[in-house]
Amino acid sequence: TLSLHDALPILSSEYNRLANMVKRTGNRPTVVANAPFGGVWYVAGGRSYMAQAIADAGGDYVFSDDRSFGGVPKDFESVYFRAGSADFWLNPGPSRSLSSLLELDERFNRFKAFGKGGVFNNTLRVNAYGGNDIWERGTLHPEEVLADLIAIMHPKLLPKHEFVYYERLD
């Protein structure tokens, strides 16, 4: 087995290979992330790891101009104004289906991504107790997370990709 010291250059190399592959495509679909909780939508700041992952996957994050590193509180209307026409919606809370997402707020069906099959959540590997493997294995394998995001936004670049963390909500 490899030590972490020996594995990091390999993982970094694969992440960079994937990110560089996306740079050759001119298409940068728009992306929004997260969902409201308790009436507040905490969007990922434009300098957050999520914003960077979306950019590395060839997406155009709708809040990329924000200078924050963490979550930024917004109301539904301000998010909808910027993200209502986004091509993809990632990580909409704990929902694993579009119907469960609508139970949270029926206005979600106004989002373009909702009506076009563009809602994906990182809930593919959640155990019976709610533990999500993206916060375990995914932190050690950012290249797997990036590959999932590329397969969502640019499926022709990774046509045989099998999702590790993300699933399309139906």
Residue spans of the language-model regions?
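Short, small-residue-biased leader/transition segments that mark boundaries at the very start
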Residues: 1-8
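A structural signal for well-ordered alpha-helical segments within the folded catalytic domains
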Residues: 2, 48-51, 140-147
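Flexible, glycine-rich surface segments
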Residues: 13-103
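Acidic/histidine-enriched alpha-helical segments
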Residues: 9-14, 31, 164-167
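Soluble or luminal CAZymes and related metallo-dependent hydrolases
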Residues: 10, 71, 141, 145
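A hydrophobic alpha-helix/topogenic segment detector
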Residues: 3, 22, 133-135
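Structured C-terminal subdomain patch of bacterial secreted/periplasmic proteins
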Residues: 91-170
